[in-house]
Amino acid sequence: MSRFRFVWTLILLVAAPGLCVAQAVCPLNGVGSRKLICMLPQALGSSGFNYALFGILNSRPFPNIKPISQAVGTRLSQLPTASPSSGISLTYDTALKTFVPSTDDNLGPIFGERASTIGPHKLFFGFSYQYFNFDSIDGHKLDSIPLSFHANPILASFFPPSFDTPACNTTGFPADGSYDGSPCFSRDYVKTSYDISLKVNQYIFYLTYGLTRHFEVSAAIPVSNVRMSVVSHATIVPNSFAPVPPFVLNRYNFFQPQIAQAAPPPTVTVPNCTVAPCFDAVFSDSRSVTGLGDVIVRAKYQFYEGERVGLAGGLDARLPTGNEENFLGSGALGLKPFVVFSYRARVSPHAEVGYELNGNSLLYGDFVATPTPTKSALPSRFLYVAGANVAVTKRITAAFDIYGQRVYGASQVVSGQLTDFGACNDSDCTVVTQGGPIPTSLIKNTDISIVDASIGAKVRLFRHLLATGNVLLKLNDSGLRAKVVPLAGLSYVF
């Protein structure tokens, strides 16, 4: 049992540091955060949108920006991984009274699973590398995510009499009366476009140990490098006129340029603004984080072994060892019971289905501009893998799988429109020019299906050493997606 103790001691040592990850918040008080979870909420500055005069536009984008950050973080924490199966099956030799490598030339699936186990007191070690270059989320290109928002509604009586802000003409304002009594600068709105670059290098170490002939335990230990950059183009559309100076060109809302002027200063200046008033600004940031991801431990039991057909069941436990604040992990315990069918032959079909239940995570909670962040439940998932392996030669097996998941209650990015309240033609806003629809992004909670095709091969380099190559191809647009995900790996059975 020394190998078993070694394997599980190693797993616990690796997992322990991440189990105590503390919660954090993305402040909007001028204090920047270097955590990846804060990149989108702070994309327009660490004070929120407090570059405009008196922060009138402050905080408006975050109801839609935060769910996008949630969707990115959640899906990064649930990337598909190769199966921790050995690829080299063992059979019991009655003459030798021990397990020996099977004469079956089929080396098994890559993303799928087969019912057979590694054999008693056998140890399998594997390593794989995957590269994700994400280019879309729910069918929307990551390099051009639009987001538009109005200024906050605010009563004109909020300001002192010396600040000439009479209630504005209500023409074009929402019919629910939420903007009635607001000054005319509430007609101003902002158009933004987010160019998001997101790349992940994922390294996974696999350990499998056979306890008995039909029962094995395994672990997948990921280490990821996540590189993220965001370029945000923001434009303030001035639909109102300020009556008198010191407002530059009689405009209320503008970015503070880095030049001397007589206007009341906002809290933060924008480096790329060189004229006054400045209505266009570009914000950019990039970060890279490397660390341990969520360790997955598995127990699998083969409860039926026929001449060719095998059936097995098991349980995956995803431990919250990865830091969710840096998109390295989910921040929640996940449990996935599963069942496996496989058929042993030169052409070997197989199938696996499972249902994952998740705990509460900061990724789905409230983490922006709050001193007391909260957690909420991650969406549950139904997962399935179906495919076949073909023994091309004694040393080469080709593998094909359909890898799918149904995510329940996920945050989905959808196209939407913001209504322009209309522009004032003078400082008294006696005449309003009607506005039109403005492209933006919205978030809705819905069930989504994510489907990929896996195509690859295993090559037996030596008796117990296998090399694996694979590509994962997206078959639909739902979720955070890369067109092609390459994988390379090595595995060995002791």
What are these regions (language model features)?
Residues 129-135, 221-227, 294, 303, ...:
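Transmembrane beta-strands of outer-membrane beta-barrel pores
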Residues 137-142, 230-236, 313-316, 323-331, ...:
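Outer-membrane beta-barrel translocator domains and adjoining extracellular loop/strand segments
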Residues 107, 119-121, 199-205, 290-295, ...:
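Residues that define the transmembrane beta-barrel architecture of outer-membrane proteins
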Residues 110-112, 189-193, 281-286, 322-327, ...:
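Extracellular loop and loop/strand-boundary signature of outer-membrane beta-barrel proteins
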Residues 22-174, 415-417, 444:
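Outer-membrane beta-barrel biogenesis signature
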